[in-house]
């Protein structure tokens, strides 16, 4: 069915290649011997390292600038993510806030909540975690049975 199907290599825009070089240069200087490298994706965290990443503008980079986001593309975010993970950077401190909690606040949060939480997330100073469990499920979120009922 797929015999003979060929895909040409994707050519990334020059801006993405430049950003990749910037991230690699940052990591070469920031990932010294004091930084614990991760061998498992998202296993390690360092609040100090997250603040360094935030100072580069690489947390909340696709969010609107009115909330201290970077107004950047998802491709740029992907380039940064790929390099951080590839280098074993300790991203666990800010990962949930950047990838889950922040976007939820952008969509469902009040203006007051957005103004309060999002700038701290983008600076790498505000962290979130998610904990869910119920009987017979443990931390297997796919097996949760609880349902919300509007009252």
Regions flagged by a language model, labelled:
Residues 66, 97, 134:
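Residue-level "edge-of-site" marker
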Residues 51, 81-82, 103-106, 128:
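A cross-family signal for key residues in well-ordered alpha-helices
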Residues 92-112, 138:
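N-terminal glycine-rich flavin-associated loop
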Residues 84, 108-110, 151:
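Short loop segments at secondary-structure junctions
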Residues 7, 99-100, 127:
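Short, solvent-exposed beta-strand edge segments and adjacent coil->beta transition regions
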Residues 69-70, 89, 112-151:
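Glycine-rich, Trp-frequent "lid" loop and neighboring beta-strands that shape
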Residues 1-94, 112-116, 120-123:
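Amphipathic, small/basic residue-rich leader segments at the start of a protein or domain
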